[in-house]
């Protein structure tokens, strides 16, 4: 059984990777937040500790999953952000190359400036803020220096349910749970959702076929924050009882002050060309996510 070291796997993405790979691989999963029985402590920003822990496990693959993802935190704490999102990725490259094993790194649609209608795998990133720049610097270092790598760009993440999902869907679900009957939703942000379960499964397929390289990896379909909210209310049967108030991004400018691209829509061109696109339509994925993780949440 092949072995995988999963660094920074205590978050929503790590949950799905653990579930998808645990039956077929011997796993060591680490994080600074040890929030599950299958996790042990490791701070991947500490190169020597990270290196020693990985080498002791002697894996066949290194998955570097963790990052700061709050844009506001990143803007306010640039050094901590670059240490976590960029320098730690360089650490992962050094370790993977030393062991001559493939490295998986997770990038983001947020590295683009949003000026184009749709971004494929070969479009040139233009990051707008500290978070986006830190992630792009990590992506670029992997591509330029890792011996073998898989870099997968995610879109608007959803997954892992109310305990670990800190993103858009959970924020909406929390408002509904609190009894909100009117939701203020921006009408000027476009993107593509990414279900963490599908994402982990698609990574597994690429690794099995040794299709190394850089890939956009988002759910099918192009959408917006507004349409995602409308679909969520439809799934929950609340479209007639909860009102959507359309606002532009300036409405939330005090709370969400970090620069965000107006459009983060990705297309999985390389996955399609390699016949490796296993990402489902975002509406199908959203319906499954709500059914599997939020069955009794609003009761």
Residue ranges and their predicted role:
Residues 3-23:
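N-terminal Rossmann NAD(P)H-binding glycine-rich loop of SDR-like oxidoreductase domains
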Residues 202-203, 209-256, 297-298:
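Mid/C-terminal beta-alpha module of Rossmann-like enzyme folds, strongest
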Residues 140-191, 197-198:
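NAD(P)-dependent short-chain dehydrogenase/reductase
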Residues 76-104:
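NAD(P)-cofactor binding segment of oxidoreductase domains
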Residues 32-46:
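Rossmann-fold cofactor-recognition segment
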Residues 83, 87-88, 111-152, 156-158, ...:
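Catalytic helix-loop patch of NAD(P)-dependent Rossmann-fold dehydrogenases
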Residues 281-299:
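Amphipathic terminal alpha-helices
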Residues 44-84:
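NAD(P)H-binding glycine-rich loop region in Rossmannoid oxidoreductase-like domains
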